[in-house]
């Protein structure tokens, strides 16, 4: 049996919506937002009414009868660490999101918007595989100092969607296979997936792992400490050096990998060096994750927007295909992944979890 599900993905510069009947898209829309539209809002929570109006306007424009919906699902925001899966939106979850208890991000609005519409219709609301999915094995949490534990913050939704898709194509199930999955986008996360759980992964948000188009990844600690106490930067500015103005932006002044690739093909030496270094660091992280899985790997999967770049992926393949076959699953369809998680629950294939 197929179900009608509305999916909601609020991002920092867009609101993405779609209605599915089973795995068929009935309609899909991406509404882009300008900085001017958000100028009067002091924080993400103040955007709620604005995003609600966007949601209603899009649904009305397509003429869809919301009374046909069986469930609503929103992008999972910054919550306490949880295992992967599909979660019912609860008052406890909403309280943590509204108070930004674990951080502020546009995705925090996903569950809130889903809950409001679902309650009006008397149907369930969910989130699926939020970025705080934490399935790390205990040994992976050691950082090297007891004051700091390693955290699992990564592109869990796309990782697990890609893992499920490739496992099915290989005639098996995600929960029965071992993968190293690399999400390549504005942030880069590489995880060791052992039989359905991401047992080790770099923290793609807070300065860990490979550098990306706009994030620094891991930095030499003492040199960064010197920068912290030099008096040249505020805490906010230093944070931007890690997330927002790190990586390719710091080296080449742009986070557009299309621009970087054009420079590489034009023979720009600085671009070539930085491009090769990013591919090198991703490859090295993949190698590290292969050790986590004791070399027993069914496939290495490259996904995310950057996986569309043949030049970039070819460099990773060249350095890692001796470990295992490399499969490219380009892009990220978060709306489809959200829908799939809810369809599995509604069909009784999986059981929903409670936050």
From Swiss-Prot:
UniProt cross-references to Gene3D superfamilies, sorted A to Z: 3.30.420.40
Pfam entry (one): Acetate_kinase
EC number: 2.7.2.7
Gene Ontology CC annotations of this record: cytoplasm
One example GO MF annotation: acetate kinase activity
CDD domains reported in the protein's UniProt record: ASKHA_NBD_BK
SUPFAM superfamilies hit by this protein: Actin-like ATPase domain (SSF53067)
Catalyzed reactions per annotation: butanoate + ATP = butanoyl phosphate + ADP
Keyword check for NAD: no
One of the protein's GO biological processes: acetate metabolic process
Keywords: ATP-binding, Cytoplasm, Kinase, Nucleotide-binding, Transferase
Cell compartment(s), UniProt: Cytoplasm
The UniProt record lists the keyword Transferase: yes
S-S pairs: none
Enzyme class: transferase
InterPro entries per UniProt: Aliphatic_acid_kin_short-chain (IPR000890), Aliphatic_acid_kinase_CS (IPR023865), ATPase_NBD (IPR043129), Butyrate_kin (IPR011245)
Family assignment from sequence similarity: Belongs to the acetokinase family.
Protein name: Probable butyrate kinase
Taxonomic lineage from the root: Bacteria, Bacillati, Bacillota, Bacilli, Bacillales
């Amino acid at each position: 049996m197929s179900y009608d599900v509305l999916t909601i993905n609020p991002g920092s510069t867009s609101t993405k919506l779609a209605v599915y009947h089973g795995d068929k898209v009935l309609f899909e829309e991406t509404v882009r937002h300008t900085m001017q539209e958000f100028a009067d809002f002091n924080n993400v929570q103040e955007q709620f009414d604005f995003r609600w109006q966007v949601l209603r306007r899009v649904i009305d424009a397509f003429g869809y009868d919301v009374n046909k919906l069986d469930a609503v699902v929103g992008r999972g925001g910054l919550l306490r660490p949880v295992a992967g899966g599909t979660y019912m939106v609860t008052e406890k979850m909403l309280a943590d999101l509204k108070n930004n208890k674990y951080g502020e991000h546009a995705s925090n609005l996903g569950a809130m918007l889903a809950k409001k519409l679902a309650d009006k219709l008397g149907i369930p609301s969910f989130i699926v595989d939020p970025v705080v999915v934490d399935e790390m094995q205990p040994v992976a949490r050691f950082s090297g100092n007891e004051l700091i534990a390693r955290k699992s913050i990564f592109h869990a939704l796309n990782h697990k969607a890609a893992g499920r898709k490739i496992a099915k194509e290989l005639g098996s199930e995600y929960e029965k296979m071992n993968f190293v999955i690399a999400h390549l986008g504005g942030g880069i996360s590489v995880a060791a997936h052992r039989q359905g759980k991401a047992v080790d992964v770099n923290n793609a948000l807070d300065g860990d792992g490979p550098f990306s188009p706009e994030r620094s990844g891991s930095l030499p600690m003492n040199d960064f400490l010197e920068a912290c106490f030099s008096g040249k930067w505020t805490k906010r500015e230093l944070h931007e050096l890690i997330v927002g103005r790190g990586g390719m932006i710091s080296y080449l002044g742009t986070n557009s990998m299309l621009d970087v690739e054009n420079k590489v093909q034009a023979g720009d030496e600085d671009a070539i060096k930085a491009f090769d270094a990013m591919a090198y660091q991703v490859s090295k992280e993949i190698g590290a994750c292969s050790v986590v899985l004791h070399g027993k790997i069914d496939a290495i999967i490259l996904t995310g927007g950057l996986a569309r770049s043949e030049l970039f992926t070819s460099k990773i393949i060249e350095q890692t295909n001796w470990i295992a076959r490399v499969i490219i699953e380009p892009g990220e369809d978060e709306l489809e992944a959200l829908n799939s998680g809810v369809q599995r629950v509604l069909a009784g294939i999986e059981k929903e979890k409670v936050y």
